[in-house]
Each structure stands twice: as structure tokens, then as C-alpha cells.
Amino acid sequence: MSNLSPDFTLPINFCANPQDAWTIPARFYTDSQAFEHEKERIFANSWICVAHGSEVARPNDYITREIIGENIVIVRGRDNILRAFYNVCPHRGHQLLSGEGKAKNVITCPYHAWAFKLDGNLAHARNCENVANFDSEKATLVPVRLEEYAGFVFINMNPEAESVETQLPGLQDKVLEACPDVHDLKLAARFTTLTPANWKNIVDNYLECYHCGPAHPGFSDSVQVDRYWHTMHGKWTLQYGFAKPSEQSFKFEEGTDAAFHGFWLWPCTMFNVTPIKGMMTVIYEFPVDEETTLQNYDIYFTNEELTDDQKALIEWYRDVFRPEDLRLVESVQKGLKSRGYRGQGRIMADNSGSGISEHGIAHFHNLVA
């Protein structure tokens, strides 16, 4: 195991050699100080994927998301420009909008009825004409950086951040190659869970298929593990494997070059292009604290009227596949606090980078360090 400092810093070359690597120490998954450090270092300075563009496609459409305690509202203006703001009134700090839906042409604070245009500028503050030196320019909503990229919506709390493409170079082209219809996807189902697991625990689980055989029999019946690869691309990775039809999970015509594409995006989003044409699933992680993560598991199809097979597949995800992963990460989170856990685990990365190799975890842990 590595020599580790008693605080929450790791050697810069941590996990640099996947074939001789150990996991991040358990305390990084369970300690509030570690989480506070990550909130500022990672989440306040990274592009976070929050939704597919179809959720806010029309003027006045809005959604809200909560990330590291910050509530963000994303709204498309009457000028068709999509913007993000901290969801807080600059007057006394009250939240402006909740949930999602169709905003009126002005956003009105429910506390004192200050009203804001959809571009964030102040429309009206009651009695402001009688307040000395009232400056409407200092009473606007505070913007959050936003980009639409590869069909999805990304936000960044760092106003000086470079582009999404700078963080995830080449990702957009690869996603479009895997799913040419990505811009036409429509949300068909969402499973939201407040998962009792650290966000890194959930990412670890996604970044290896070592567990697929024992824990996901339906998925493993479709994926061809001997034709499965995991490649690293800086702050994103790609798991790619050929698929075969299965009565337990994915049903499609045999003889096609059907494949799985599993994209992990720094820090904690997962895009899954399935063997079913015109289908994609996305796992959005929104960390709450060191041992809790809000997850949206979204299923998308290009068609609005679902077929019976699509409905059955949604049920399989809801009742079988999704619970399998939730049970795993919840159990691991408990085990990381056990006296019987030695504090770090050996990363099972083999020399060939096979379909069951855990080199993806080593890559992720090196980025976290």
C-alpha cells in the first residue's frame, strides 16, 4: 500500500501504475472533511452534466438541480438562449423556483415579489423607486456557466472555466458516432434514488465489469466479455463491447454488429448507448454529503410512443438491473467502515486490459488524487 499523509491529500502519482495499484483509502469515502475538500476542488470547478437538452428545448422551459448544496435553475429564455443561475433571490436569499416546468415570462420571488426576466435581469422590485441609491444592476440573478454539448446540458460554477470540450476532448465526436440520434432523444423514464453511498463508490462500480458476471446475470447474458474493452481518454473513458440478444435483457436481431458503449464523464456522469437502436441511458450523480448521493437514472428513446418491448426493457431496468447496482454500492459503503476492511483494496488490473480488468478504477483514482 502507498504511504499516505494523515490529512486528505494523496501522492500526485497515486495509482499511476494500474498493475500495482491500491484503491483510495476508505476514509476518503466516509469523512466529511474529505467531501468538503472535493466540493471545492472538484465540483465547484468542473463541468457537470445535469440533463438532456430535450428537457429545456422550448422557450420558458426550466429545470432545477442541486449540486453540493447549491440549487441551480436552468431556463430557456424567450430569445431561445439557455441560461443557468443560482436559484436564489439577491434581495434576501429566498429560493425562486422549484422542480421543473414552464416559467412565466418573469420569475417572481415568492417572498417579496421581486421579479426577474429570464435573462436574469431585474424586472421589478416593489418600492425600489423610494429606496435611496437602489441599483438594479446589482440586483440581477447570479449566472452559472452553461454549455450545450453532445445533446446534453452542462454547468460549471467556476465563471473562468474553459469549455466542456477542453475538459472532455473528443467526447462529443465519439458520442455522436455511437448514437447519431443523440439530439433527438426524449426522456422515457427516470428513476430517482437518494443512495446511501459516496459518489466515488458509485463511479468505482461503473468503471469495471469485473462484477458483471456475478452481479448482473441479465446484462452478462448479452455482453460478450471476451470482446469487451475499456479505454482511457483523460477525463472520460469508454467501455465498449459487442452484444448478443438475450431473453433476459436486450432483444434485437441476431447477426448485427450491436454493441454497448459506456462513457464515464469526469467527475460523475455515465452515458450508456445500448444495443437497441435509438436508445440511451444516463446516470446523473448529484453528491449530497460524504455518504449520500442523489441519482437520476434516465432512460431515453428517440420515439415518443413506446413499444411493448421498450416498456418491458424499462421495467427490467427498474426492477432488475438498477436494484442490482444499488445493492452493491450500499453494501460497499457499509463495508468501508468495517474494522474488518484493511483501509485499501487491491485494484485488479490485468496486463492485457481485459474485459474484467479494473484499470478504469486506477485511472479514476489517479484523477481524484
Sequence positions of predicted segments:
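Short, contiguous pre-domain boundary segments
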Residues: 6, 11-26
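Non-catalytic accessory segments flanking enzyme active sites
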Residues: 24, 28-67
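Generic structural signal for secondary-structure transition and capping sites
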Residues: 43-47, 94, 211
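Short Pro/Gly-enriched beta-strand edge/turn motifs at strand-loop
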Residues: 45-55, 125-129, 264-269
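Rieske [2Fe-2S] iron-sulfur-binding domain
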Residues: 55-159, 163-173
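C-terminal catalytic domain of Rieske-type non-heme iron oxygenases
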Residues: 76, 87, 147, 152-369
